[in-house]
Amino acid sequence: MQILLANPRGFCAGVDRAISIVENALTLYGAPIYVRHEVVHNRYVVDSLRKRGAIFIEQISEVPDGAILIFSAHGVSQAVRNEAKSRDLTVFDATCPLVTKVHMEVARASRRGEESILIGHAGHPEVEGTMGQYNNPQGGMYLVESPEDVLKLEVKNDARLSFMTQTTLSVDDTSDVIDALRARFPKIVGPRKDDICYATTNRQEAVRALAEQADVVLVVGSKNSSNSNRLAELAQRMGKAAYLIDDASDIQEAWVKDAACVGVTAGASAPDILVQNVITRLQELGGGEAVPLEGREENIVFEVPKELRVDVREVE
């Protein structure tokens, strides 16, 4: 059995930054550190940080006065930000800068009195945070997930209308929704490039190349990870058996026993150690050496806040 690795895969710059913010806060200030929502959607990462003293909460009211609070990579609404500001809390923001960019687009539309449409998945924390940047009662903020949603949407003034997208969507599906928006609302204005982030786009491109060669595709990522789910869906749409797994223990021998080639990739919030463990398990099941495919090189780095830049040797 051949093992192929998608490239790129795993951590993106925004996830790397968010995890570093929590780790550095724990190093500098000690436990407990409170984090609103899972800092990234990966069970292994969250469990590891919890063992170090991170406490994951959903409501600001759960945080005691004087504590340190970190916003997750998915971002928060202005209401949550204002609630935290009203408390005696030290706040660090781990929102991905590419999510913040979308927040700024929504806030700008709100100030101008334009109505805004967000393409995204209802209930996802990034969507809740982005929708929560709009606060102009004269306008309106709407959420759509599909071309069908667009057909049913009623706005107040289609002459002053803009759209934004969640950063972790399917590139193909989003393109269909944008086409539907432009057909329904010819004057709608969007970003120069859709808001789907570089890492999401690159990983979908990589899993497409992987699925062209593999009989079975394993996507390392947690069930609540939007971008990981999109990778598995894309491989399935290409007619391949694809499975979303948290770690190597999820692999069922029946999935791969008749496969000549198994492809492995990982969502943007999945650490490489999980991929290495999957490779080891596949080799136990008869796989050969893992061969990485060629792909786009990623060199993007997002700096942590200067207050949290720490040389661990200085605090040992």
Swiss-Prot record:
What cofactor does this one take? [4Fe-4S] cluster
Q: List the disulfide bonds.
A: none
Broad class of enzyme this protein falls into:
oxidoreductase
Where along the chain is (2E)-4-hydroxy-3-methylbut-2-enyl diphosphate bound? H41, H74, H124, T167, S225, S226, N227, S269
Q: Which UniProt keywords apply?
A: 4Fe-4S, Iron, Iron-sulfur, Isoprene biosynthesis, Metal-binding, Oxidoreductase
According to its UniProt entry, the protein's GO biological process terms are: dimethylallyl diphosphate biosynthetic process; isopentenyl diphosphate biosynthetic process, methylerythritol 4-phosphate pathway; terpenoid biosynthetic process
Cite the cofactor comment: Binds 1 [4Fe-4S] cluster per subunit.
Q: Where does dimethylallyl diphosphate bind?
A: H41, H74, H124, S225, S226, N227, S269
Query: Is Iron-sulfur set as a keyword in this record?
Result: yes
Q: Its annotated pathway?
A: Isoprenoid biosynthesis; dimethylallyl diphosphate biosynthesis; dimethylallyl diphosphate from (2E)-4-hydroxy-3-methylbutenyl diphosphate: step 1/1; Isoprenoid biosynthesis; isopentenyl diphosphate biosynthesis via DXP pathway; isopentenyl diphosphate from 1-deoxy-D-xylulose 5-phosphate: step 6/6
UniProt-annotated binding residues for isopentenyl diphosphate: H41, H74, H124, S225, S226, N227, S269
Give this protein's Gene Ontology molecular function annotations.
Answer: 4 iron, 4 sulfur cluster binding; 4-hydroxy-3-methylbut-2-enyl diphosphate reductase activity; metal ion binding
- List of residues binding [4Fe-4S] cluster: C12, C96, C197
**Catalytic-site annotation from UniProt:** E126
Its recorded reaction(s) are: isopentenyl diphosphate + 2 oxidized [2Fe-2S]-[ferredoxin] + H2O = (2E)-4-hydroxy-3-methylbut-2-enyl diphosphate + 2 reduced [2Fe-2S]-[ferredoxin] + 2 H(+); dimethylallyl diphosphate + 2 oxidized [2Fe-2S]-[ferredoxin] + H2O = (2E)-4-hydroxy-3-methylbut-2-enyl diphosphate + 2 reduced [2Fe-2S]-[ferredoxin] + 2 H(+)
Name the Enzyme Commission number(s) assigned to this protein. 1.17.7.4
Recorded hits in PANTHER family, A to Z, give:
4-HYDROXY-3-METHYLBUT-2-ENYL DIPHOSPHATE REDUCTASE
* Its biological purpose: Catalyzes the conversion of 1-hydroxy-2-methyl-2-(E)-butenyl 4-diphosphate (HMBPP) into a mixture of isopentenyl diphosphate (IPP) and dimethylallyl diphosphate (DMAPP). Acts in the terminal step of the DOXP/MEP pathway for isoprenoid precursor biosynthesis.
Assembly description: Homodimer.
Instruction: State the family it belongs to.
Output: Belongs to the IspH family.
Q: Which protein, by its recorded name, is this?
A: 4-hydroxy-3-methylbut-2-enyl diphosphate reductase
